[in-house]
Swiss-Prot record:
Coiled coil: none annotated. It is found in: Cytoplasm. Peptide chain release factor 2 directs the termination of translation in response to the peptide chain termination codons UGA and UAA. Disulfide bonds: none annotated. The gene is prfB. One of its GO terms (molecular function) is translation release factor activity, codon specific. This is Peptide chain release factor 2. Methylated by PrmC. Methylation increases the termination efficiency of RF2. One of its GO terms (cellular component) is cytoplasm. Pfam families: PCRF, RF-1. The modification N5-methylglutamine is found at residue 250. The lineage of its organism: Bacteria, Pseudomonadati, Pseudomonadota, Alphaproteobacteria, Rhodobacterales. Keywords: Cytoplasm, Methylation, Protein biosynthesis.
Length: 374
């Protein structure tokens, strides 16, 4: 067996070992038996929310077991084919099996990354906010480009995207937009996108065709699961209704029933501008609870993050990625050093490489400063 093929097998085995560890493969069959017993309980659906949560957890376990077993079996089958092909001097059989192992390596690596999405809220749906930075029309246009980028990414994933609120820019683009993205692991994938995103390009709004730098921020926070109890003291909030209107476009609603909720202790402000005022109150309150939950997650992780980060790595919580369109084309993540010259693809939603690099870095135990220094 050639050295490169052996190396491929070792990489698959490494991914398989991590999957087995995350799954706790020895106890998985017993846990599935417990789930099955609970599913057969005739009183299960007396509490629909708890029942749905149980069914989701059971399905996640079933899928994880199937993934592990499938990769393990496919690897063994192709190793056997290579050995038989070499014994019988059948180059075609060997070549086909080697190609299958290379494809399996990619699949196993992807499943390994997905297995890292095991944080408390990683499996949840998510809210995603985009806000234009200082810079007027330039930043508003950049915020609009970012919003489109994330909508395209979510659509490619098969996620459901709902616009919660949007404020148009004075001349072009948007000042802000909030989306709800629904799908398994939506928060887990997107959580690393929070931060400041920098764009460098020749401005389409500058008659002198000068190069401009624009900034917009992204904030991602999980939709609060019904089983997570977040209490909001009515005395701590102010609810305002207002008229929401924009300059036009398919995303703009015009309504007298838009709702803004301000949470005084934290200064958090959330809005919703659907047609129903009652619906807007519910949407805005859910968004507020989600933001408060994200604050709690941040507090819990503060000590870990402080220990994890190099003290000189001041850019992590602020600027996370640069998008250079002129004088050359490059998108680079400042935390992981992952980069690509396919700027068009990135702005069209091809973000998985960046997200995977961040997950891999966090799993490696390296500080972001160490990653930046190679």
């Amino acid at each position: 067996m050639r050295a490169d093929v052996q190396n491929t097998i070792e990489k698959i085995q490494k991914s398989l070992d991590l999957l087995a560890q995350r799954l706790d493969v020895e106890t998985a069959p017993y846990r599935l038996e417990e789930f099955n017993a609970r599913v057969e309980d005739p009183t299960l659906w007396d509490d629909p929310d708890a029942a749905q949560k149980l069914m989701r957890e059971r399905q996640m376990l079933v899928d994880a077991m199937a993934t592990h077993d499938s990769i393990k079996q496919e690897m063994a089958d192709n190793i056997e084919l290579i050995e038989l092909g070499e014994m019988e001097d059948d180059a075609d059989v060997v070549s086909d099996a080697e190609n299958a192992l290379r494809a399996l390596e990619e699949t196993a690596a992807k499943k390994e990354l997905e297995a890292l999405l095991d944080g408390e809220a990683d499996s949840n749906d998510t809210f995603l906010e985009v806000n234009a930075g200082a810079g007027g029309t330039e930043s508003c246009d950049w915020a609009s480009m970012l919003a489109r980028m994330y909508v395209r990414w979510a659509e490619k994933k098969g996620y459901k995207v709902e616009l919660q609120s949007m404020s148009d820019g004075d001349e072009a683009g948007i000042k802000s937009a909030t989306y709800k993205i629904t799908g398994l692991n939506a928060y887990g994938w997107l959580k690393s996108e929070s931060g400041v995103h920098r764009l460098v390009r020749i401005s389409p709004f500058d008659s002198a065709a000068k190069r401009h730098t624009s900034f917009s921020s992204v904030w991602v926070y999980p939709v609060v699961d019904d089983n997570i109890d977040i209490e909001v003291n009515p005395a701590d909030i102010r609810i305002d209704t207002y008229r929401s209107s924009g300059a036009g476009g398919q995303h703009v609603n015009t309504t007298d029933s838009a709702v803004r909720i301000t949470h005084h202790p934290t200064g958090i402000v959330v809005t919703s501008s659907e047609k129903s005022q009652h619906q807007n109150r519910d949407i805005a309150m859910k968004a507020l609870k989600s933001r408060l939950y994200q604050l709690e997650l941040d507090r819990r992780n503060a000590a870990i993050n402080e220990a994890h980060e190099n003290k000189g790595d001041a850019g992590w919580g602020n600027q996370i990625r640069s998008y250079v369109l002129q004088p050359y084309q490059m998108v680079k993540d400042l935390r992981t050093n992952f980069e690509t010259s396919d700027t068009k693809g990135v702005l069209d939603g091809d973000l998985d490489g960046f997200m995977a690099a961040t997950l891999a870095l966090d799993a490696s135990g390296k500080t972001r400063a160490e990653a930046q220094n190679g």
